[in-house]
């Protein structure tokens, strides 16, 4: 018994010693870089990410704070001419190095460095892309970061680099690189590059952005999809599509990380560089609106498909709902299908105290439980800002929301139990906060609906995950 107690004490003492040593390094690391003093007393280099503080140069790395640039020469440190804008604020040079954020640019002459534009720089011989955005350092694991934080706290290593400004050298070229008009891409007359990466086979003379349709029916040029009459690209990725004049791109509400491309001639759909299974085309998006959804849902010959952001692939949500092809979208995310009314709505599932964090995000297609034969009649818009709409079905009034979940409105359709609320909604001086209060105090009430279809992206497992019987793949 005494030996066992002695062993337990030794183990506990060891754990405490390791914990003390670990904390003794991590806590000093948190206060080692004087962020507040740099912000308050540092001297910024123009509108760049660089600041001179205490005769040393620091670079601001979004999501990671300030980084000391040990090799930077403060006396000769400079921004390049015509480089004091957003796309060039992360690039600088001194008499020894060129800098992309806090990292040096290899094989680059800082004395002859000039700006080309759109994040591209050249020394007359070598050309490099230095991104104006940061990217997470996937080579640094959580355990490695903690270990490096500990070493940094004790002064044994540099601050761990969790985020960084990506840089990409371009191939040597006899012909100087130039920015292509209207696209922001760069070319030497033979090859074309997106963010420093080759777009294989692209024709620089014909390459142009794909048209992107907006919610207000206007059209803008894509910043990620391009075509040249033969090839189609997402960023630098060559897509397995033939170029057609009818190609167009679109986004769904607040799902800004998901850029969609659609070919009406073939019915083929693409999300970023992920192609929907061609064998199930033609596809048709159920709704182009996304204020209340977490996934874009596409009808096909084999059912409804969506992009799973966690698994990074196209998945099957279920069978096509009956008569969905004949439904009419009378307002964003709200449909009439004969005497039925259907609507799309998103939901999130979060863990509790024992397992906190986001578990899943879903998008459901519901059938409104009120299926009376009365027609829908639009009563009016909610202010000139078009926050939403008031509709009537028989003797019942409803509020159709356009603000979305990001504005704390939980669903696209609400029941209006009192006529006084209808008059308040149609008031010209109604504010967004008034709508939130109405939804909170019951003047706008959640409707009752029957779930017809559900698409779920699961970010972590819960104790009820085994109850998920939705189709997959």
Report the location of each language-model feature.
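N-terminal Sec-pathway targeting helices
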Residues: 1-20
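Non-catalytic tandem-repeat scaffold regions and their flanking low-complexity/translocation tails
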Residues: 22-473
């Amino acid at each position: 018994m005494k030996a066992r107690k002695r062993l337990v004490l030794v183990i506990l003492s060891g754990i405490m010693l390791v914990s003390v040593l670990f904390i003794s390094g991590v806590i000093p690391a948190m206060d080692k870089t004087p962020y507040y003093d740099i912000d308050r007393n540092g001297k910024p280099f123009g509108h760049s990410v660089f600041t001179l503080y205490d005769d040393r140069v620091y670079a601001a790395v979004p999501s990671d704070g300030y980084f000391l640039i040990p090799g930077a020469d403060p006396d000769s440190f400079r921004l390049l001419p015509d480089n004091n804008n957003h796309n060039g604020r992360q690039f600088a040079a001194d008499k020894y190095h060129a800098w992309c954020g806090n990292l040096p640019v290899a094989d680059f002459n800082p004395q002859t460095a000039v700006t080309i534009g759109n994040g591209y720089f050249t020394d007359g011989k070598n050309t490099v892309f230095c991104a104006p955005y940061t990217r997470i350092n996937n080579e640094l694991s959580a355990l490695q970061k903690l270990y490096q934080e500990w070493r940094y706290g004790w002064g044994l290593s540099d601050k761990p680099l969790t985020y960084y400004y990506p840089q990409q050298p371009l191939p040597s070229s006899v012909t100087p690189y130039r920015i292509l008009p209207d696209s922001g891409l760069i070319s030497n007359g033979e090859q074309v590059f997106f963010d420093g990466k080759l777009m294989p086979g692209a024709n620089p003379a014909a390459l142009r952005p794909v048209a992107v349709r907006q919610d207000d029916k206007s059209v803008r040029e894509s910043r990620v999809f391009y075509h040249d009459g033969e090839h189609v690209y997402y960023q630098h990725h060559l897509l397995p599509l033939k170029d057609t004049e009818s190609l167009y791109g679109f986004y769904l509400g607040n799902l800004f990380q998901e850029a969609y491309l659609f070919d009406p001639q073939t019915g083929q759909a693409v999300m970023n560089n992920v192609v929907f299974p061609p064998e199930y085309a033609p596809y048709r998006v159920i709704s182009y609106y996304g204020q209340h959804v977490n996934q874009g849902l596409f009808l096909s010959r084999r059912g409804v498909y969506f992009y799973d952001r966690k698994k990074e692939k196209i998945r099957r949500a279920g069978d096509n709902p009956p008569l969905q092809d004949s439904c009419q979208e009378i307002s964003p995310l709200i449909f009439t299908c004969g005497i039925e009314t259907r609507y799309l709505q998103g939901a999130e599932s979060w863990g509790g105290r024992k397992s906190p964090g986001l578990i899943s995000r879903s998008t459901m297609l519901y059938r409104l439980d009120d299926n009376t034969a009365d027609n829908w009649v639009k009563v009016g818009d909610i202010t000139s800002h078009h926050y939403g709409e008031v509709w009537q079905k028989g003797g019942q009034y409803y509020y159709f929301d356009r603000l979305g979940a990001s504005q704390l409105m939980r669903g696209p359709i609400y029941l209006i139990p009192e006529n006084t609320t209808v008059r308040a909604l149609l008031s010209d001086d109604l504010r967004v906060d008034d709508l939130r209060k109405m939804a909170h105090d019951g003047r706008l009430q959640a409707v009752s609906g029957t779930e017809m279809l559900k698409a779920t992206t699961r970010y972590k497992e819960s104790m009820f995950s085994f109850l998920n019987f939705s189709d997959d793949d």
